[in-house]
Amino acid sequence: MARAVLVPSAPTLAPASRRRRNARRPRRASHATCVNAASYEKTWSNPSGTVMDVIEERKDSSVFACARPFVWNDIDVGGRMGVVKMRDGSLWIHSPIELDDATRTEVDALGPVKFVVSPNYEHVKYAKQWKEAYPNATLYGCPGLKAKTAGVIPYDVDLGDVPGTCPEEWNGEFQCEHFDSETTPLIGTPFFNEVVFHHIPTATLFITDLVWTYPANSVGGVDVPFGTKVWKALMDKLYLPVYLNLMVTKKTRFAESVGKVAFEWRWSTLVPCHGTVERGERARRIVRDHLERS
């Protein structure tokens, strides 16, 4: 996925007392539920217009997401940051988005930010901003990213240096899989070099650019723009076959990774960076079908 720019419009905030109350007691629903009344302009990528949505809520941990327009060549390809409130109350951030005032208010209301993760080579734009805002948090990069961005982004840990790519300090709450099976043509280096994460307590899968779930026509009462429809068609019909058949050069290794993520791991909610949150067997089928086209 090419780098793009997050462009949220200025949110309208609810009274602070209501924001704090609702942030402490997020509601659970079959679909994402807003944490508070703060809002952005409604777009297909954020049809509720909310700053943060509740995705999963369990007794001892929860998952939230912040969806924003993600504009590439005037096309909104959608962007979503995942937030996990871990069992100890600390926060794990997946693929950080721009940390504007409204987003920071919501994040800070949930708990202390302890871990921030850039899951692949592309989703790095706001990593430095988050590290500066939360200097005590550990900033993780996918394998090779720390060296790749040396002097630009201050990554603390390269997940390639961590056995199994899952740090001990995550207290066994995650399963991690590094898709180290691709090569960029003519260059010979990895393309995404993505790590996929499963938060076990909430049965939630976080995936970045390996799988997308773009809606065909509308979502949440908001029509999908023509440009986004064209983007979806190009990604589905042109890019994905090229990626799976040409760029994935280690077929056996790729199949092993797909086997773990799509079949072995016991997740039920899919939180993609690009597209809609999906649940249940439909979500698992999307991942299987997407990654088994080769």
Give short role names for the model-derived ranges:
Residues 60-66, 92, 172-176:
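Short, hydrophobic/aromatic-rich segments at coil-to-beta transitions
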Residues 68-70, 96-98, 121, 144-145, ...:
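Active-site metal-binding loops of divalent metal-dependent hydrolases
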Residues 38-49, 53, 93, 144-293:
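Metallo-beta-lactamase
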